[in-house]
Amino acid sequence: MLKTIQDKARHRTRPLWAWLKLLWQRIDEDNMTTLAGNLAYVSLLSLVPLVAVVFALFAAFPMFSDVSIQLRHFIFANFLPATGDVIQRYIEQFVANSNKMTAVGACGLIVTALLLMYSIDSALNTIWRSKRARPKIYSFAVYWMILTLGPLLAGASLAISSYLLSLRWASDLNTVIDNVLRIFPLLLSWISFWLLYSIVPTIRVPNRDAIVGAFVAALLFEAGKKGFALYITMFPSYQLIYGVLAVIPILFVWVYWTWCIVLLGAEITVTLGEYHKLKQAAEQEEDDEP
């Protein structure tokens, strides 16, 4: 009886171990941690230009003046660790200084922000091992659309939410809405990763695989955010070493960790599709045998 149970358990866990082995092999072959380091470097270089371009768009639309403040607080509260307030203060100072730049400097900011999107595109297509390249004009149009429409859609979403909450009939739903808002960062991360894994690669990505990979990445991102914040508050020894410069390594480590999670979700998505193909090929060979 015990042997039968062990055989069943071994038979059920064998596909999982095979998939994990395939996942580890792909992570090693793609040099995932090196790609994450490259993206972290480009992200830090592009962070201030990207934020400057986004909030310059909000400034161009007076109707989004209040929403931009809400969106800014939401981003720093939910996508940065416990030191987000310090990082926010520095970034806002940098953005305020960037507003004094000339037209040539503003073009440089836009190019630097687009550089980050190009790096993300290149890294994900490296993981998917896609040889097909998009036309340059099409890629630029997609990057520009994301850079301009993305913040405006996020601002419109927050504006609509604020308006609905201000209505009298919604007052009785505040408790339900509060509970929904608790998981809103997780849902937002899930949707963002799903869109990233579905749209950016130049080859077709199965929707089911993208949803699973995005969900794992969203869970790891939320867990990593809370774990990183806990480490910073419980073990503040880094402040003794770096002093006032402590925010620099904290931001770099967090950005690097975030890109590791994003790329891991991409690797999971790719490996799921690859594993299904290998499994179907093995089953086909068994059916063809006499």
From Swiss-Prot:
Chief subcellular location: membrane
Pfam families membership: Virul_fac_BrkB
Similarity field: Belongs to the UPF0761 family.
Record's keyword terms, sorted: Cell inner membrane, Cell membrane, Membrane, Transmembrane, Transmembrane helix
HAMAP family: UPF0761
Stored PANTHER family: INNER MEMBRANE PROTEIN YHJD, UPF0761 MEMBRANE PROTEIN YIHY
InterPro entries referenced in this protein's UniProt entry, alphabetically: UPF0761_bac, Virul_fac_BrkB
Protein name per the record: UPF0761 membrane protein YihY
Gene Ontology CC annotations of this record: plasma membrane
S-S bonds: none
Residue ranges crossing the lipid bilayer per the database entry: 44-64, 104-124, 140-160, 183-203, 210-230, 244-264
Compartments in which it is found: Cell inner membrane
